């Protein structure tokens, strides 16, 4: 299962990307996370359906300093995994 997830609210400047990277690594997911200039955080998760769904649930909560006002997720194409850094299962990417 591959899902593209976008979180909106107080999600930048609160450790959200580090939280996502830590949790996704713990769930053995592949993918990436990045800030967007519009103030949202975007992440791609690839792995077993139960692990991806667990990660999406964690994103709804976020780290303690965050407030997720909205979360959208959609099916993603495997080509989007290519955005991560070579040799990494899960990457934090630059802002777009």
Curated annotation (Swiss-Prot):
<dbReference type="GO" id="GO:0003998">
    <property type="term" value="F:acylphosphatase activity"/>
</dbReference>
<feature type="active site">
    <location>
        <position position="17"/>
    </location>
</feature>
<feature type="domain" description="Acylphosphatase-like">
    <location>
        <begin position="2"/>
        <end position="94"/>
    </location>
</feature>
<dbReference type="InterPro" id="IPR017968">
    <property type="entry name" value="Acylphosphatase_CS"/>
</dbReference>
<comment type="similarity">
    <text>Belongs to the acylphosphatase family.</text>
</comment>
<dbReference type="InterPro" id="IPR001792">
    <property type="entry name" value="Acylphosphatase-like_dom"/>
</dbReference>
<dbReference type="InterPro" id="IPR020456">
    <property type="entry name" value="Acylphosphatase"/>
</dbReference>
<dbReference type="InterPro" id="IPR036046">
    <property type="entry name" value="Acylphosphatase-like_dom_sf"/>
</dbReference>
<dbReference type="Pfam" id="PF00708">
    <property type="entry name" value="Acylphosphatase"/>
</dbReference>
<keyword id="KW-0378">Hydrolase</keyword>
<protein>
    <recommendedName>
        <fullName>Acylphosphatase</fullName>
        <ecNumber>3.6.1.7</ecNumber>
    </recommendedName>
</protein>
<feature type="active site">
    <location>
        <position position="35"/>
    </location>
</feature>
